[in-house]
């Protein structure tokens, strides 16, 4: 019986709980399993008073911002680096990304000043397509994002402007991560190398 082997089931929730906690005065929000973009969407909805269901362009930009931030140093060159082909300066002191966003949803990707790494159109493009399956329908609990018309523009050193993400309502179902007992053990490793 399958029910006898289930160990866990975690539904990926959206930003509403985060926004509510902030509205109630929380300085720190601890959540259960939420989607990665929800960690950005929640504070933006709170700060700018957005309605998740009525602002498709703002929400598209919020989902994109959260998606670019979700893996931290990936968008600042950590995953992009391929020594000798795609060089990233001072990779050993990789800086984490920052998003500077306004109430319209327009934003710039940058990084901590003085840190290593690289924020470029290419690092942003590479992170945008990471784990999304379909650029026209990236499913999150808060919205189905459409990244098919997104543009990235280098506006300064380690500064990239991101525009034109939108959404098409919420998905009908939510993602669930299920763990079950089945006598399988896996091990993985990622190695990086390059010509240098």
Model-derived features: positions:
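Alpha/propeptide regions of enzymes that mature by internal proteolysis
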Residues: 1-42, 48, 68, 121-141
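Short coil/turn connectors at secondary-structure junctions
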Residues: 2-3, 23-27, 31-36, 60-65, ...
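Catalytic cores of large soluble enzymes that bind and process phosphate-bearing ligands
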Residues: 6-13, 56-60, 113-120, 168, ...
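Flexible loop/turn segments at secondary-structure boundaries
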Residues: 37-39, 85, 118, 184
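Short acidic (Asp/Glu) and glycine-rich catalytic loops that position anionic groups and cofactors
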Residues: 45-48, 102-111, 180-190
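Short acidic, glycine/proline-enriched helix-loop-strand junctions
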Residues: 45-52, 59
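A conserved active-site cap/scaffold subdomain adjacent to cofactor or substrate pockets
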Residues: 57-161
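C-terminal non-catalytic interaction/assembly regions of soluble proteins
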Residues: 141, 146-196
